[in-house]
């Protein structure tokens, strides 16, 4: 019944198994991949006919994690998986980026890749396995895919590269880098690093590339057993159309791309395009070509003209040379009520970035396959349509916004102070108000400034820069701080963020084969120069964190109480803690280890809450004097609340010097009194005294009398000695 085929290799000290022919047999390609005890199913289905009216590759990638993979049931009312989580969205993009450039030009068939996590062993992150399984399924599917690709995760522990570190090793690593590519070339890099050098980063990329070669060989071996016949793809020769169009509009198109201002340039290019379309579709005549085809040729011509111009003259669209960064204006503290804010403008790209500080109540609970954890640093990126002069629908967060936000998050996280030193929940929001290239890196720069403006003690300021590449044969140009057009028309999008000490994040997407290690080395070196320049421009606005937190930010004080006192501080059903919060106005968070965080924008509220909590969590000391309130008057004495929630008895004989006939002659309920703790009776009840304390000054009269008596005893002896 099953026509099963499989291959198995040892990879990074663990078995990797790829199997097809048993599960999801009606898909064009289906592979069950197992690494350790983590299992994923990758399927590929491509439509039989091209999609009408599109001039792009209609590819969708969906990665989904099933909670049963970790032996868990989903939360919520419906008890089933809902919309994609952030992790699922990010891994979907991670798979999409290296496979998209490998589809044959002209492939317009709707293609869907679905990857499902079936089992998770809590050791091997499924993302790498998902990439490998997707590559294998595509290679088997018959779709025109110029793969296969391999992928690997690279760590850096104790100054050594580690292949596919397990989840328990991740807290120790200085690097979390994912690299994917073919046997000849690197196509995609995604990473977070703790201020590592460019040499270490490049070494990690090449280490990963070398170590996923056995995976590519395994996929090829599986394809030799089970691959479907390749689909036919008719490639249309448009060289004659391009030659005719080039003669018609070349000079005008070159002139349009010499206009530095983006909107003016777009308008000029639009007019040239209208001229080309009018030429190929004369009124009253039967058109010889499809309009979409002519538009596609025009797009190709645009790319060639921009690329030729850069390689031939060294000048870019806006007149810069390959290494120059656009003019930068950095401002901090631009919003009066925000805890921290910055406006970062680089050319026609602008980000308004705002930092908000919160407490433990604001932490984000993340439900993942590995379990639930709390996230204390959030970075959200918003890209409204007005930022590129367009109209559009506002609504849910798009995949691109999630991806760009995570890239900036990775760049900033390594320079944040440890949570035990700065116990705030931090949310950074980047509003892209203008965009013409590398808005994610503008978000990094703006986030660094906004955090420092809020008083967050970053290790060092952080900046980011986007690099591009034009490669034609042996000639190439690495471009610093690319424009949007250079991103679309170039061969590489290479984003690097970091401090003056090293790289904190690297993301690379390469659209073609042939990018050598030497080219990547040049790009990293040029990116470092650009990053240092940007940091210098940012320092004109703010070069270090402000000494004080933002005026409107909450203050947090942290201290510890004995764990056996937590229940008393919280009270039955939270009664005590609610009373503390209501009466002091401070927020209180108590952790299982006894760590208490008290937060408020009012310092007096914090002091009052701390005093209250400490009075509950600690024990009164015998012989100490305390202020208290009479809470109950009895015939035999008065009960006084004197130490947080603790009450004690002042016996009628301890109310005042001399004989007291009635307790009410001395005190009444609500009176503020000063008492001394005498001790505890045989039943553990607290014994207090008022008569040994001066009710005006709080002085210990008993101690005073003893001191005076001692002085009198010593006086005759001193006189005799004289």
UniProtKB/Swiss-Prot annotation:
Keywords: Cytoplasm, Magnesium, Metal-binding, Nucleotidyltransferase, RNA-binding, Transferase. This is Polyribonucleotide nucleotidyltransferase. It catalyses: RNA(n+1) + phosphate = RNA(n) + a ribonucleoside 5'-diphosphate. SUPFAM superfamilies: Eukaryotic type KH-domain (KH-domain type I) (SSF54791), Nucleic acid-binding proteins (SSF50249), Polynucleotide phosphorylase/guanosine pentaphosphate synthase (PNPase/GPSI), domain 3 (SSF46915), Ribonuclease PH domain 2-like (SSF55666), Ribosomal protein S5 domain 2-like (SSF54211). It comes from Rhodopseudomonas palustris (strain BisB5). Residues 623-691 form the S1 motif domain. Its EC number is 2.7.7.8. It is found in: Cytoplasm. The gene is pnp. GO terms for biological process: mRNA catabolic process; RNA processing. Belongs to the polyribonucleotide nucleotidyltransferase family. One of its GO terms (molecular function) is RNA binding. Residues 701-713 have a biased composition (Basic and acidic residues). Residues 691-722 are annotated as: Disordered. PANTHER family: POLYRIBONUCLEOTIDE NUCLEOTIDYLTRANSFERASE (PTHR11252), POLYRIBONUCLEOTIDE NUCLEOTIDYLTRANSFERASE 1, MITOCHONDRIAL (PTHR11252:SF0). Mg(2+) binds at residues 487, 493.
């Amino acid at each position: 019944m099953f026509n099963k085929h499989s291959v198995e290799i040892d990879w990074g000290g663990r078995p990797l198994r790829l199997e097809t022919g048993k599960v999801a047999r009606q898909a064009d390609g289906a592979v069950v991949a197992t690494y350790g005890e983590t299992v994923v199913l990758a399927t590929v289905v491509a439509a039989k006919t091209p999609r009408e009216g599109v001039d792009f590759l209609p590819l969708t990638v969906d990665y989904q994690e099933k909670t049963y993979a970790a032996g868990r049931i989903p939360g919520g009312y419906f008890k089933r998986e809902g919309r994609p989580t952030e992790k699922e969205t990010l891994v979907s993009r991670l798979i999409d980026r290296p496979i998209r450039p490998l589809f044959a030009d002209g492939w317009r068939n709707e293609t869907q890749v679905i990857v499902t996590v079936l089992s998770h062993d809590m050791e091997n992150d499924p993302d790498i396995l998902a990439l490998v399984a997707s590559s294998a399924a595509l290679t088997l599917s018959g779709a025109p895919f110029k793969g296969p690709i391999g992928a690997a995760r690279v760590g850096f522990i104790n100054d050594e590269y580690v292949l596919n570190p397990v989840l328990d090793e991740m807290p120790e690593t200085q690097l979390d880098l994912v690299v994917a590519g073919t046997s000849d070339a690197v196509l995609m890099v995604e990473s977070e690093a703790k201020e590592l050098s460019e040499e270490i980063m490049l070494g990690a990329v090449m280490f990963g590339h070398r170590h996923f070669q056995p995976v590519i060989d395994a996929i090829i071996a599986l394809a030799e057993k089970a691959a479907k016949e390749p689909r036919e793809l008719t490639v249309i020769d448009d060289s004659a159309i391009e030659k005719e169009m080039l003669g018609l509009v070349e000079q005008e198109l070159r002139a349009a791309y010499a206009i530095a201002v983006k909107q003016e340039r777009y308008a000029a290019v639009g007019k040239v395009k209208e001229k080309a379309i009018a030429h190929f579709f004369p009124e009253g005549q039967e058109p010889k070509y499809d309009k979409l085809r002519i538009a596609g040729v025009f797009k190709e011509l645009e790319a060639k003209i921009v690329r030729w111009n850069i390689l031939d003259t060294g000048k870019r669209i806006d007149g810069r040379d390959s290494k120059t960064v656009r003019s930068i204006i950095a401002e901090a503290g631009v919003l009066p009520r925000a805890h921290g804010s910055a406006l970062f403008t680089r050319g026609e790209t602008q980000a308004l970035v705002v930092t908000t500080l919160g407490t433990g109540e604001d932490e984000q609970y993340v439900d993942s396959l590995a379990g639930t954890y709390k996230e204390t640093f959030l970075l959200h990126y918003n890209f409204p349509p007005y930022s590129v002069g367009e109209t559009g629908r506002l609504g849910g967060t798009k995949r691109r916004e999630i991806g760009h936000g995570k890239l900036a998050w990775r760049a900033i996280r390594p320079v944040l102070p440890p949570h035990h030193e700065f116990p705030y929940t931090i949310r950074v929001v980047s509003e892209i108000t203008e965009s013409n290239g590398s808005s994610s890196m503008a978000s990094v720069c703006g986030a660094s400034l906004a955090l420092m403006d809020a008083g967050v003690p970053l290790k060092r300021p952080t900046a980011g820069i986007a690099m591009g590449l034009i490669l034609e044969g042996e000639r190439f140009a690495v471009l610093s701080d690319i424009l949007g057009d250079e991103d679309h028309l170039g061969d590489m999008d290479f984003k690097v963020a970091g401090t003056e000490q090293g790289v904190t994040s690297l993301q690379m997407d390469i659209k073609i084969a042939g990018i050598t290690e030497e080219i990547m080395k040049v790009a990293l070196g040029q990116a470092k120069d650009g990053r240092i320049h940007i940091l210098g421009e940012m320092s004109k606005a703010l070069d270090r964190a402000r000494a004080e937190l933002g005026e409107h930010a909450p203050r947090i004080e942290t201290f510890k109480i004995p764990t056996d006192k937590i229940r008393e501080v919280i009270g039955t059903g939270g009664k005590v803690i609610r009373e503390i919060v209501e009466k002091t106005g401070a927020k209180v968070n108590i952790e299982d280890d006894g760590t208490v965080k008290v937060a408020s924008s009012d310092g007096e509220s914090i002091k009052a809450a701390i005093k209250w909590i400490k009075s509950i969590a600690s024990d009164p000391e015998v012989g100490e004097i305390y202020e208290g309130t009479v809470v109950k008057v009895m015939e035999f004495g008065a009960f006084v609340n004197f130490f947080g929630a603790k009450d004690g008895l002042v016996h009628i004989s301890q109310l005042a010097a001399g004989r007291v006939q009635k307790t009410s002659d001395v005190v009444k309920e609500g009176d503020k009194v000063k008492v001394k703790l005498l001790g505890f009776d045989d039943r553990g009840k607290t014994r207090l005294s008022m008569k040994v304390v001066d009710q005006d000054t709080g002085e210990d009269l008993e101690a005073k009398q003893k001191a005076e008596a001692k002085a009198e005893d010593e006086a005759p002896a001193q006189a005799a000695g004289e």
